[in-house]
C-alpha cells in the first residue's frame, strides 16, 4: 500500500533569523498540517553583523550598502547580495527538490515574492513550485526590484497571513502584496504583531488551502 502523498514546502526565514530558528518558530503551524505537508528550511546567504560570535543572524539582501543592514521601510536604490541569494535558493531547489510550494516570513516572504516574479518573467526556473504562503509579507522598496514588484502574478495560488498589531510590517503592506496576485488569495488576519502566530484558530482555512494544493499535485501527477 503506497503512502499518502504530501506537499513539500521550502521555507525562507526573516531578516536576522536563520533556518533553525525559523524551524522552531513555525513548529505549531507545521504540526497543524503534518498529515498534508513536509517542510524544508534554507539558510540565508549573508551574515548580519549583530554579534561577531553569533552566526545565526542571516539576511537575503541589504537595503543599506554602507551599514550592510536591512529595513522593510527603507526606499533604496540598492539590493546588496540579492542575486547571490537568488542563485543560492535556485541551487538549493535543484539539489533538494522537487518542492511544491514556498513559504516565507517578513524579508523571507518578500524574497519568495521576488523569486516567483523572476520565474514568471523567465529569468529563473522554479520547477514544480505552484503556490506560496506569506507571513508578514511586503513588496520590496528597492528600485532594483521595480520590474518584479510591479508585475502581476498570474495563475499562482497564495495565502497571506498578517498581524493587526504588526509594527514592523503593517497590515496594509501585506495586503498590497496580496493584491498583486491574480488568483484571489486566502487572507488571514491575526491580532498579534510581527510573528508567525499560532494558527490553531485558522486550522480549517490553512488545512483547506493545503488540501487544494495537494489535490492539484495529485491531479498533475
From Swiss-Prot:
SUPFAM superfamilies reported in the protein's UniProt record: alpha/beta-Hydrolases (SSF53474)
Keyword tags: Hydrolase
Top-level class of the enzyme under EC nomenclature: hydrolase
E.C. number(s) listed in UniProt: 3.1.2.-
Molecular function terms, GO-annotated: hydrolase activity
SS bonds (residue pairs): none
Family named by the database record: Belongs to the LovG family.
Protein name listed in UniProt: Esterase C25G4.2
Species whose genome carries this gene: Caenorhabditis elegans
Amino acid at each position: 500500500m503506497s503512502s499518502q502523498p504530501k506537499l513539500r514546502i521550502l521555507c525562507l526565514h526573516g531578516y536576522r533569523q536563520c533556518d533553525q530558528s525559523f524551524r522552531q518558530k513555525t513548529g505549531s503551524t507545521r504540526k497543524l498540517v503534518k498529515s498534508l505537508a513536509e517542510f524544508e528550511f534554507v539558510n540565508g546567504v549573508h551574515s548580519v553583523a549583530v554579534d561577531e560570535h553569533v552566526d545565526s543572524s542571516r539576511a537575503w539582501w541589504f537595503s543599506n550598502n554602507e551599514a550592510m543592514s536591512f529595513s522593510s521601510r527603507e526606499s533604496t536604490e540598492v539590493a546588496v547580495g540579492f542575486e547571490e541569494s537568488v542563485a543560492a535558493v535556485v541551487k538549493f531547489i535543484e539539489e533538494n527538490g522537487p518542492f511544491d510550494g514556498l513559504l516565507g516570513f517578513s524579508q523571507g516572504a518578500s524574497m519568495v515574492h521576488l523569486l516567483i516574479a523572476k520565474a514568471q518573467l523567465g529569468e529563473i526556473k522554479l520547477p514544480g513550485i505552484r503556490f506560496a504562503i506569506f507571513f508578514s509579507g511586503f513588496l520590496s522598496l528597492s528600485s532594483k526590484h521595480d520590474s518584479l514588484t510591479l508585475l502581476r502574478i498570474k495563475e499562482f495560488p497564495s495565502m497571506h497571513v498578517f498581524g493587526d498589531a504588526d509594527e514592523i510590517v503593517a497590515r496594509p503592506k501585506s495586503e498590497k502584496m496580496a493584491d498583486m496576485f491574480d488568483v484571489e488569495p486566502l487572507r488571514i488576519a491575526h491580532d498579534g504583531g510581527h510573528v508567525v502566530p499560532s494558527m490553531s484558530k485558522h486550522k480549517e482555512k490553512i488545512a483547506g488551502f493545503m488540501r487544494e494544493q495537494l489535490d492539484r499535485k495529485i491531479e498533475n501527477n
